[in-house]
Amino acid sequence: MQSTSQLSRPLNGNLELTLTIPWSRVQKAYDSAVDEAVADAQLPGFRKGKAPKDLIEPKLDRNHTLSHALGHLLPEVYATAVKEHDLKPLLNPQIKIVSGKEGETWTFTATTCEAPKVILPEKLKALDKLVAETKVVIPDLLIEEEANHRLAALAENVTTLGMTIEQYLTTKKLTAEELKAKLAQEAKSDLVSEFTLLEVQKTKKLPDRKATLDFLQKLV
C-alpha cells in the first residue's frame, strides 16, 4: 500500500497537504533506522557494527528511533505529493502529526505556499497607485516567515546597540504582540509590492527589477 495525499487551498493563501502513510511503510522506515543504529553500535566483545540486532534493538529509545525514521520518510512522501499535485513551494513545509498509532495508518499535514496569483488592473500606473488596485492574496505563511526574519534582524540590531528587546519595546511604547503585528503588516505591504513588480516585469517582459521600477515611474 502506497502513501496518499490530498491538497487543500485555504482562503489565507497557504497550501495544505494531508499525507497518509500506511503502517507498513512506517514500519519499514523504522526497521531501516534500527539497522542504521546497529551498524553504528559498539558493544563489549564485538567490533563496531557487528553486535547482533537482538542485543542492540532493546537498548534503543523506540520513540527516538521512530522520529529518526520519520525524518527520512516524511521528506520522501512530501516530495512525491508536491510532484503529484504539480506544486512549486516557496517555503519548506510546516509538518504536524494528525494521528499516529503503531499498527495503524499515520496522517500528517504539511503546510506551505506558492507564489500568489497577481491580477493587475487593466491600466498600469505608478507603483503606489498600482499596488492599491492590484488583487493579490499573500499567503499567511509567507507573511509570517518575512515578519520573523524582520524580528530576528531587529533583535540583532537592538543587541548591537546594547539594549534588550524588552527595553526597545519600552522606548517604543509597544507590547511584544503589537510589535509582531506591526512587522507582519509591514511584511505584507512589502510583499504585495514585490509580487506586483514581478507580475509587471513578467507581463511587460522587462529584464529586471530596476527596469520595472523605471517603467512604472514614467506612468501617470
Where in the sequence are the language-model features?
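Short small/polar-residue motifs
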Residues: 1-6, 90-94
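Extended, charged alpha-helical "arm"/coiled-coil substrate-binding scaffolds
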Residues: 2-73, 113, 122-220
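Extended, domain-scale alpha-helical bundle/helix-rich regions
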Residues: 73-74, 81-114
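Short alpha-helical functional segments enriched in proximate histidine and acidic residues
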Residues: 80-81, 194
